[in-house]
């Protein structure tokens, strides 16, 4: 009897140890609230909107200890609309992220649908990623700092941190037989995070970026399953839909002193290789600069403010499109997992841009993620609640 009890205890201890070597975590965010747009194609818009501060999601994250410091990892992350229950990211089951890989003391290699290096290293320094949500992102999220687009079929390496310094890279296979370079996406980035100072730099290059009707929908044997997200923003949609190459160079930094953090970002976005329209054999360039400020007024209350300026290219002598944008935010934490927030954004546009047909038109204000204004000005306000689990 004693031997049987000892055997059961030993077996239970062994099973517990084996179980501890692997784990699967269910996590998620539910972000919901009221949003106001003072000019949605010429009309006021009041309504509920899901996922403004952060996209509503749930996911599974797992790891298995393989021994010797090597681990198998995976992430499957779904995006959804709280108001309708519909899938986000073009209807994909795991449209936000879906990858599997190996992690070791020498770095992590993952394969699947993932974020590019600009998102990883520069995106977190933008106001939209910190406290402003997607409506505080740069116009149309033209530099993808706010991860409007993911990369399919991607192989990615991320280094460990060396005294605060880390780096990484991503390459996405084009998936077109006989045309190795077509539809490919590649990206490189590096960052430094040590004490009060955070720095980031990144590069992104995508061939035929809007192939199959949406940014980065590359290399699928059945393109209808790749989560089409048509580029409809009037800020750069006409360029993205006809360019052969989309290129982003981004950099940013932030410094914390006491309860305050001041930061800045810069991006240079180019659309190259046009075959039709006013930019044939030319390059359309957008430069964006942002300064942002965050203040931890109390352990539960964060205040934020940001200003960013975007300038596009001149179109055959016409004045370049220019976008001035200011954002304010207040975020109050009811607990570690639940907060309520208020965000306000104002944008003013001037100059000229292209419409969907390639015609030169006056630039209109277009706050990211919202219906564009019918004039040069637009105001948006958001009151929301976010719960993490």
Language model features by range: what are they?
Residues 1-21:
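Gram-negative bacterial Sec-dependent N-terminal signal peptides
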Residues 9, 59-61, 99-101, 156-158, ...:
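Outer-membrane beta-barrel architecture
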Residues 22-36, 46-177, 182-205, 345-349:
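Outer membrane beta-barrel
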Residues 40, 86-88, 121-127, 211-215, ...:
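Outer-membrane beta-barrel and related beta-rich outer-membrane complex signature
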Residues 43-46, 86, 142, 174-175, ...:
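Extracellular loop and loop/strand-boundary signature of outer-membrane beta-barrel proteins
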Residues 50-53, 90-92, 147-149, 180-182, ...:
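Short sequence motifs at beta-strands and strand-loop junctions characteristic
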Residues 191-327, 331-332, 346:
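Detector for outer-membrane/organellar transmembrane beta-barrel domains
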Residues 334, 375-389:
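Outer-membrane beta-barrel "beta-signal"
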């Amino acid at each position: 009897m004693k031997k049987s009890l000892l055997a059961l205890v030993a077996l239970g201890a062994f099973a517990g140890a084996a179980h501890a070597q692997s784990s699967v975590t269910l996590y998620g965010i539910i972000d919901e609230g009221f949003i106001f747009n003072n000019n949605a194609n010429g009309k006021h818009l009041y309504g509920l909107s899901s996922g403004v501060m952060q996209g509503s999601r749930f996911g599974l994250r797992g790891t298995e200890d393989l021994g010797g410091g090597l681990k198998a990892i995976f992430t499957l992350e779904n995006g959804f609309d709280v108001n309708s229950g519909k899938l986000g990211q073009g209807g994909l089951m795991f449209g936000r992220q879906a990858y599997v890989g190996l992690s070791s003391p020498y770095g992590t290699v993952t394969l699947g649908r993932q974020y590019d290096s600009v998102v990883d290293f520069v995106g977190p320094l933008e106001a939209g990623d910190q406290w402003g949500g997607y409506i505080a992102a740069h116009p149309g999220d033209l530099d993808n700092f706010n991860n409007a687009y993911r990369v399919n079929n991607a192989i990615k390496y991320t280094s460990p941190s060396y005294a605060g310094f880390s780096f990484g890279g991503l390459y996405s296979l084009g998936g077109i037989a006989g045309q190795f370079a077509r539809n490919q996406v590649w990206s490189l980035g590096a960052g430094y995070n040590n004490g009060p100072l955070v720095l980031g730099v990144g590069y992104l290059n995508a061939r035929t970026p809007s192939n199959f009707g949406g940014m980065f929908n590359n290399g699928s044997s059945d393109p209808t399953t790749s989560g089409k997200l048509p580029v409809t923003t009037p800020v750069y949609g006409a360029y993205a839909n006809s360019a052969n190459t989309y290129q982003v160079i981004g950099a940013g930094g932030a410094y914390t002193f006491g309860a305050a953090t001041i930061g800045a970002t810069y991006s240079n976005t180019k659309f190259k290789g046009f075959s039709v329209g006013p930019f044939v054999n030319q390059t359309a360039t957008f430069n964006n600069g942002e300064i942002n400020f965050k203040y931890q007024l109390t352990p539960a209350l964060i205040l934020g403010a940001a200003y960013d300026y975007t300038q596009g290219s001149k179109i055959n002598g016409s004045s370049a499109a220019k976008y001035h944008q200011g954002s304010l935010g207040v975020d109050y934490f009811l607990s570690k997992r639940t907060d309520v927030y208020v965000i306000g954004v104002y944008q003013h546009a001037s100059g000229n841009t292209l419409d969907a047909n390639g015609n030169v038109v006056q630039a209109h204000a277009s706050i990211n993620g919202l219906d564009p204004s019918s004039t040069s000005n637009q105001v948006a306000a958001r009151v929301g609640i976010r719960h993490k689990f």
